[in-house]
Structure formats: structure tokens, C-alpha cells
Amino acid sequence: MEPSLATGGSETTRLVSARDRSSAGGGLRLKSLFTEPSEPLPEEPKLEGMAFHHCHKDPVPQSGLSPERVQARRQLYAACAVCFIFMAGEVVGGYLAHSLAIMTDAAHLLADIGSMLASLFSLWLSTRPATRTMTFGWHRSETLGALASVVSLWIVTGILLYLAFLRLLHSDYHIEAGAMLLTASIAVCANLLMAFVLHQTGAPHSHGSTGAEYAPLEEGHGYPMSLGNTSVRAAFVHVLGDLLQSFGVLAASILIYFKPQYKVADPISTFLFSICALGSTAPTLRDVLLVLMEGAPRSVEFEPVRDTLLSVPGVRATHDLHLWALTLTYHVASAHLAIDSTADPEAVLAEASSRLYSRFGFSSCTLQVEQYQPEMAQCLRCQEPSQA
């Protein structure tokens, strides 16, 4: 076998057999793999596949929303409308019933509306191309929207906690138990309706919980779920939490309706549900801060990515490895690969990129290939980051 490299990055290996040598009168008869497919060599699909996505996960960006995202947008529109109508009803009902527990439930619905609006906004912005000013596009608008939703919920919840504390100090307040019971019953029905609207039949199954409420990722290696799926699933998780809180408010209203002397259940339930509401925003706030601080994606660890790059044939060392999340569903990686002098830079680049895309689902990878130098082992700038 005599391999030869042709221009254009393709390999044209030809076979030479003893039988061909004798039949040709001492000369060589070259048999091309491209003209005689009866003796093919093993193909390397990974290297060939990289021609279609040389530096991106997707070969060609979509010009509009996919059918899945269109369906997700419809679900979010419907759920947002239902949520807004019943939130307004809870505000009115809570005011008429003088119930802080109802108002707390309405505040939680306000956070849900903000989360769904952020998801809808991100779905719309995902179709806008990057510009020379916004070179990464508008992806982080979703993160900013989630941050605004969390801040607004904290402000409203803080006000309600202050009012509940005043009610515990001074018991000169009256609860309209009938209006409170009616409003709480309607809130339960509203959350059941939103859960039905957002329920995804045949959604991909996943094990474990990501802790991200507005755009969770699948745990482990592999491609993140699409934005449409994650947005609807996050809203569905929100609604399930609201449903449990609405059942709690309903239980408190039933107690006050039949036992008016236990009206203290209203400020007490306000305290409990406010803590639950603030606690439910903790994963979202953590993910938002991680994205804004250019932190590594929670579903991707540093060591496996480094080891994957070092396992590529020809790679001696890697440095300047950076992993960050542009959003919770858009992961980016960049690294320098120090290779042997005998290694083919194009082959190393293609293989390393292919492994990063297939194993970790990065949306964009930037790899710089350079010759290995012994001085790299002592270079302070080439050392790995600390564990913290």
C-alpha cells in the first residue's frame, strides 16, 4: 500500500499488489479506490463529517423558527395569557378578601409571567443574526429577562413579608373568608389549566434534575435540548410549583372560612409561601450569575473536556482551555492544542472538533493548533486553572 496526499485535504490511497506487478510486465498497476470500489479502505466518518460543520454544531442556521419552536411559542403564549388573567383576578380577589396569602400567590404568578415572557423574547431573538456590534447575537437577552423576573419577585415578596409581619404584631385585620376561598379555588383551577396547556406529550425523557427553572439542560454529555423544549418544560415546572402553593392557600382559606378565629393562618401561610417563592428562584439566580460571570456550563466539566482533547492522536498538551455558557443552552469552548511535529494539523483539528461536538454538545468551538515546545510545561500562562 502506498498512500499519497492530494491537494484539497482529501486522501487518495492506492493499492499495489504482487499480482498486478507481474501482470504488468514488471511495471506497477495502480488501482484507485475511487474507480474500483471492490477493495475499499475503512472510511473515517468523523473527519468527513467535519466538512459540513467546520466550527459550528449546525451546518446552516435556520432562517426562522423550527416547527418545534413554533409549537413551544404557541404554548407559551396561551399559558402567559391564562397566567396574566388569573394573576389579575388574584390581585383583585386578594384585595377584596384582605388576604396576603392570595397576594403572595399572585406575586408568584407574576414571576411566572416574567419567565415566560423572557422565554418568548429569547425565541424571537434566536432568529435574529449577529451583527458587527453584537457579534454573539442576542442570546443573553433570555438571561437578562430571567434576572429581571427574579428581582421583581424578590421586591414584591419583600413587601408582602413586611405586611405579614405587621399583621402578626397587630391582629386588627379582617379576612373575607368567602372571597378568599373563591379566589383560591379559581387559582387552583387556573394552575391546572396552565399545566394542561404546557404539558408536552412525547417529550424526551431525562434522568435527574438540572435545577434550572427557565432553561434546563439534559444532564451528562450530549447535545442540549432545544430552546423550545427547555422553555416549555421550565414553564411547566414553574406551574407545578404554583399549583402546590395554590393548594396551600386553598387549605388556609378553608380553615379561615370554617374557623374565623384562626385568621392568623393568612400571615403565617404568607411567610411559608414567600420562603418557598424565594427558594424557587435560587436555582435560576445561580444559573443567571454563572452565565453572566462567564462560568463553565454546569453540565460540562473541565477535566473530561481536557482529557478528550489530549486523547486525540498527535496532541501532546493543551492550554488556554476555556469553557463558558453564552446561555444555558449555548455552550462555547476554545483551546490551544500543542501537537507533535509529525502530526497533521488539519486532521488533529477535525478530530478534536468532532469529539467536542459529539461528546459535549458545544454550539461553537475555536481551536488553535501549534507545535509542541518543551518550555510549555514550565510556562505559567500555560498552566491549568485552579479547582475553585
Swiss-Prot record:
Segments of this protein annotated with the region Disordered: 1-41
Membrane-spanning residues: 76-96, 106-126, 146-166, 178-198, 236-256, 264-284
Chief localisation class: membrane
Recorded catalytic activity of this chain's protein: Zn(2+)(in) + 2 H(+)(out) = Zn(2+)(out) + 2 H(+)(in)
Keywords assigned by UniProt, alphabetized: Antiport, Cytoplasmic vesicle, Endosome, Ion transport, Lysosome, Membrane, Metal-binding, Phosphoprotein, Synapse, Synaptosome, Transmembrane, Transmembrane helix, Transport, Zinc, Zinc transport
Single GO cellular component term: neuron projection
One Pfam family hit: Cation_efflux
Disulfide-bond pairs as recorded: none
Tissue: Expression is restricted to brain (at protein level). In the brain, most abundant in hippocampus and cerebral cortex. The mRNA is also detected in testis, expression being restricted to germ cells and highest in pachytene spermatocytes and round spermatids.
A GO molecular function held by the record: zinc ion transmembrane transporter activity
Cited SUPFAM superfamilies: Cation efflux protein cytoplasmic domain-like (SSF160240), Cation efflux protein transmembrane domain-like (SSF161111)
Localization in the cell: Cytoplasmic vesicle, Secretory vesicle, Synaptic vesicle membrane; Synapse, Synaptosome; Late endosome membrane; Lysosome membrane
Entry keyword Transmembrane helix: yes
Membrane topology value: Multi-pass membrane protein
Domain of life: Eukaryota
Sites bearing Phosphoserine, chain numbering: 63, 66
Cytoplasmic side: 1-75, 127-145, 199-235, 285-388
A biological process from GO: detoxification of zinc ion
Parts of the chain on the Lumenal side: 97-105, 167-177, 257-263
Disruption phenotype: Homozygous knockout mice lacking Slc30a3 do not display overt phenotype with morphology, body weight, lifespan, fertility, litter size being normal. Zinc ions are eliminated from synaptic vesicles in brain of the knockout mice and the overall levels of zinc in brain is decreased.
Residues annotated to bind Zn(2+): 108, 112, 238, 242
Family membership noted in the UniProt record: Belongs to the cation diffusion facilitator (CDF) transporter (TC 2.A.4) family. SLC30A subfamily.
Function text: Probable proton-coupled zinc ion antiporter mediating the import of zinc from cytoplasm into synaptic vesicles and participating to cellular zinc ion homeostasis in the brain.
PANTHER family the record matches: CATION EFFLUX PROTEIN/ ZINC TRANSPORTER, PROTON-COUPLED ZINC ANTIPORTER SLC30A3-RELATED
Record note on quaternary structure: Homodimer. Homodimerization is negligible compared to the human protein. It could explain the lower efficiency of zinc transport. Interacts with TMEM163.
Record protein name field: Probable proton-coupled zinc antiporter SLC30A3
Organism: Mus musculus
Lineage: Eukaryota, Metazoa, Chordata, Craniata, Vertebrata
